[in-house]
């Protein structure tokens, strides 16, 4: 009886290219979806920062020691020294690293906190 040799089946170059192409397509789809989620996360974080800055500054104003103009002028110091938040200066940045805008409203009776980048993201 003759011995039969078993041949090893190897992967051809074409099969390997097909697998790599499929991996690339799947990775691209995941990366595209991830980008949208990251943008939504930045929008949410910026909205939360704006709300927290507003709340802390209005609490300082409500304490009765400072006028609205003084609160806005001293926002960095007030946020850093506030018992209501940690790392107050970090709150004055949006998720894209740009400074938040803190100003008085048109009537002069309230504070407005906004982000230029957030406005452009919400429009687009």
Curated annotation (Swiss-Prot):
Membrane topology: Peripheral membrane protein
GO cellular component, one term: cell outer membrane
Membrane spanning residue stretches: none
Keywords: Cell outer membrane, Membrane, Signal
Superkingdom of origin: Bacteria
Cellular location(s): Cell outer membrane
InterPro entries: N_methyl_site (IPR012902), Pilin-like (IPR045584)
Signal peptide bounds: 1-31
Classification via NCBIfam families: IV_pilin_GFxxxE (TIGR02532)
Name the UniProt record assigns to this protein: Putative outer membrane protein TC_0858
Source organism (scientific name): Chlamydia muridarum (strain MoPn / Nigg)
Taxonomic classification: Bacteria, Pseudomonadati, Chlamydiota, Chlamydiia, Chlamydiales
């Amino acid at each position: 009886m003759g011995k039969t040799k078993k041949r090893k089946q190897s992967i051809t170059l074409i099969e390997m290219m097909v697998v790599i192409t499929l991996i690339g397509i799947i990775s691209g789809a995941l990366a595209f979806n991830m980008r949208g989620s990251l943008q939504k996360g930045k929008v949410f974080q910026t909205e939360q920062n704006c709300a927290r800055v507003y709340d802390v500054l209005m609490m300082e104003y409500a304490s009765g020691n400072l006028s609205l103009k003084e609160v806005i002028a001293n926002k960095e110091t007030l946020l850093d020294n506030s018992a209501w938040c940690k790392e107050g200066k970090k709150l004055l940045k949006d998720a894209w690293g740009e400074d938040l805008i803190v100003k008085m409203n048109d009537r002069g009776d309230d504070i407005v906190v906004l982000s230029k980048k957030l406005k452009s993201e919400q429009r687009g």
